[in-house]
UniProtKB/Swiss-Prot annotation:
Assembly mode: Interacts with CHD4/Mi-2; the interaction is direct.
GO molecular function, one term: DNA-binding transcription factor activity, RNA polymerase II-specific
Location of region: Disordered: 91-133, 267-289, 385-409, 426-446, 509-531
One of the record's GO cellular component terms: nucleoplasm
Name of the protein in its database record: Zinc finger CCCH-type with G patch domain-containing protein
Record-linked InterPro entries: G_patch_dom, Znf-CCCH_4, Znf_CCCH, Znf_CCCH_sf
Ranges in coiled-coil conformation: none
Record-listed N-acetylmethionine modification sites: M1
Role: Transcription repressor that specifically binds the 5'-GGAG[GA]A[GA]A-3' consensus sequence. Represses transcription by recruiting the chromatin multiprotein complex NuRD to target promoters. Negatively regulates expression of EGFR, a gene involved in cell proliferation, survival and migration. Its ability to repress genes of the EGFR pathway suggest it may act as a tumor suppressor. Able to suppress breast carcinogenesis.
Tissue specificity statement from the Swiss-Prot or TrEMBL entry: Widely expressed.
Basic and acidic residues: bias regions: 518-531
Phylogenetic classification of the source organism: Eukaryota, Metazoa, Chordata, Craniata, Vertebrata
Modified residues (Phosphoserine): S373
């Protein structure tokens, strides 16, 4: 409503109020007076609201008029300042000649005032950025990159010299991310040694827009982050949703189930889709790194004596085109090499060096098996290389161990005859090529001392495994007895471990029985052949 309509409405309300007051003075019934008094109160409240609206409309119109007149006034002020500067510049030499060094020209204060103005502008920019919500990167101690919602608390210079800001993470998942309660007040005594977060300096180029948590995708069975009593956000899974309240079960066995509201739950930071995308990127692009498995090492990888050595193919050096994204490996690291190359004038797609004749593709990094020392890796590579060469030079075996020249069968003795009769096979079946069921036992009869020693060693190792498994079963049963009626989750896991240990014990006992049977057969044959 404009100013005129508000004024007319205000006059109407005041006239109605006067009529109501006259009616109250006429001496009506008590019921009618109650209605009139209520109407009187409503009219007074309405008049106050209308007056407030009228004042705000008049204020806005005055501000608009001032804005229209401000450019002209600003030009007049600038012109006046220009005239003062000219007069000071003309009068300053004369004053200096007349009075020596009595006065200092105001022009000398120009740089100081300019510096002061620049500091004021920087202070204003810092005040504007302070409190802004952004999405900032966080590198965990094991090297993964995650983006967390954070709040800017100040501006600082980054490590590489670029413009940066100090941020505090809003949803801390670790104690090192939890903001220190005394930092913002300036009362923290530990400073850099504080176990809580005093903020992290992040480059402005790495910041992303703030992302509001989308709770619409959360349902029963979904993975999430839930806030615990310690103020940290832990990984959990939703078990029930009821009128905005979420029942979550934390992944950690040390934390119990909890019921939280919408402000205490978040979608996971890394969804399954993003993880699969990152995995596919890491496996699909072979120009960054190549993983060497512990079981299969080709001849080209035998030259990799340590993880820092690079395996470079001739096609990577000679090729003039780059098949990988520029600086794509820096997505998974803290590297700034791409930015340094760009500042030094490198153009994407060209080779390194002064005349752009260097390599185009990045160097392949060879990743050796985890948990192995360099000596073990070198020994494994050399062994597999020697085995591969020996396998290629070794001629194929054309004859069996017991074959005779000319194709004549081996001489048969009385024990072969007895074995054939006891096993129910026809004579000559061995010469026909069909392997008998007791061939392994027969080989054990004629085995050497080294084979029998190996059999005894296998039997001893199996007995040790049985004893170890029995000790594990006893310890699991004791743990079950301690946790009876306490933790259902821990009891269920212990039951699974107990069932697995009992299955393993049964397999080991069967293996022990088979080895004992073979050993008895070998001993029986030895006794029968001694006359």
């Amino acid at each position: 409503m404009d100013e005129e309509s508000l004024e007319s409405a205000l006059q109407t309300y005041r006239a109605q109020l006067q009529q109501v007051e006259l009616a109250l003075g006429a001496g009506l019934d008590s019921s009618e007076q109650a209605d009139l008094r209520q109407l009187q109160g409503d009219l007074k409240e309405l008049i106050e609201l209308t007056e407030a609206s009228l004042v705000s409309v008049r204020k806005s119109s005055l501000l608009a008029a001032l804005d229209e007149e401000r450019p002209g006034r600003q030009e007049d002020a600038e012109y006046q300042a220009f005239r003062e500067a000219i007069t000071e510049a003309v009068e300053a030499p004369a004053a200096a000649r007349g009075s020596g060094s009595e006065t200092v020209p105001k022009a000398e204060a120009g740089p100081e005032s300019a510096a002061g103005g620049q500091e004021e502008e920087e202070g204003e920019d810092e005040e504007e950025l302070s409190g802004t919500k952004v999405s900032a990167p966080y590198y965990s101690s094991w090297g993964t990159l995650e983006y967390h919602n954070a709040m800017v608390v100040g501006t600082e210079e980054a490590e590489d010299g670029s413009a940066g800001v100090r941020v505090l993470y809003l949803y801390p998942t670790h104690k090192s991310l939890k903001p220190c309660p005394f930092f913002l007040e300036g009362k923290c005594r530990f400073k850099e040694n504080c176990r809580f977060s005093h903020g992290q300096v992040v480059s402005l180029d790495e910041l992303r827009p703030f992302q509001d948590p989308d709770l619409s995708s959360l349902q029963a069975g979904s993975a999430c982050l839930a806030k615990h009593q310690d103020g940290l956000w832990h990984a959990a899974r939703i078990t029930d949703v009821d009128n905005g309240y979420y029942t979550v079960k934390f992944d950690s066995l040390l934390l119990r189930e909890a019921v939280v509201e919408g402000d205490g739950i978040l979608p996971p930071l890394r969804t399954e889709a993003t993880e699969s995308d990152s995995d596919s990127d890491g496996t699909g692009d072979s120009s960054y790194a190549r993983v060497v498995g512990s079981d299969a090492v080709d001849s080209a990888q035998s030259s990799a004596l340590c993880p820092s050595l690079a395996v470079v193919g001739s096609d990577a050096v000679d090729s003039g085109t780059c098949s990988s994204a520029f600086a794509g490996w820096e997505v998974h690291t803290r590297g700034i090499g791409s930015r340094l190359l760009t500042k030094m004038g490198y153009e994407f797609g060209k080779g390194l060096g002064r005349h752009a004749e260097g390599r185009v593709e990045p160097i392949h990094a060879v990743v050796l098996p985890r948990g192995k020392s360099l000596d073990q890796c070198v020994e494994t590579l050399q062994k597999q290389t020697r085995v591969g060469k020996a396998g290629t030079n070794k001629p194929p075996r054309c004859r069996g161990r017991g074959a005779r020249p000319g194709g004549r069968p081996a001489p048969r003795n009385v024990f072969d005859f007895l074995n054939e009769k006891l096993q129910g096979q026809a004579p000559g079946a061995l010469e026909a090529g069909a392997a008998p069921a007791g061939r392994r036992s027969k080989d054990m009869y004629h085995a050497s001392k080294s084979a029998k020693r190996a059999l005894s060693l296998r039997l001893f190792q199996t007995e040790e495994k049985i004893e170890r498994t029995q000790r594990d079963i006893r310890s699991i049963q004791e743990a079950l007895a301690r946790n009876a009626g306490r933790h259902s989750v821990a009891s269920a896991q212990l039951q699974e471990k107990l069932a697995g240990a009992q299955r393993q014990l049964g397999q080991l006992r069967a293996q022990e029985a088979g080895l004992q049977q073979e050993q008895r057969k070998a001993d029986t044959h030895k006794k029968m052949t001694e006359f």
